From Swiss-Prot:
One of its GO terms (cellular component) is ribosome. GO terms for biological process: translation. Keywords: Metal-binding, Ribonucleoprotein, Ribosomal protein, RNA-binding, rRNA-binding, Zinc, Zinc-finger. A zinc finger (C4-type) spans 7-37. This is Large ribosomal subunit protein eL24. Binds to the 23S rRNA. Its cofactor is Zn(2+).
Length: 63
């Protein structure tokens, strides 16, 4: 049974055979659901918590 992986940027599920796999020099594999997530993470170094369209937003500090 193929397993579902999740996007490293937005956290949405990725079906087998879809998305972009990015392998870093140290061997870690980052999977992205779309080119939008890939470019935001790799090219622009954006923080996913600051993007309104990202699903895996974390609540800001409530201290």
């Amino acid at each position: 049974m193929p397993r579902i992986v999740y996007c490293a940027f937005c956290g949405s599920p990725i079906k087998p055979g879809e998305g972009i796999s990015y392998v870093k020099n140290d061997g870690t594999v980052l999977r992205y659901c779309s080119s939008k997530c890939f470019k935001s993470a790799i090219k622009y170094h954006r923080d996913p918590r600051r993007q309104k369209w990202v699903r895996k937003q974390v609540a800001h500090g409530s201290s």
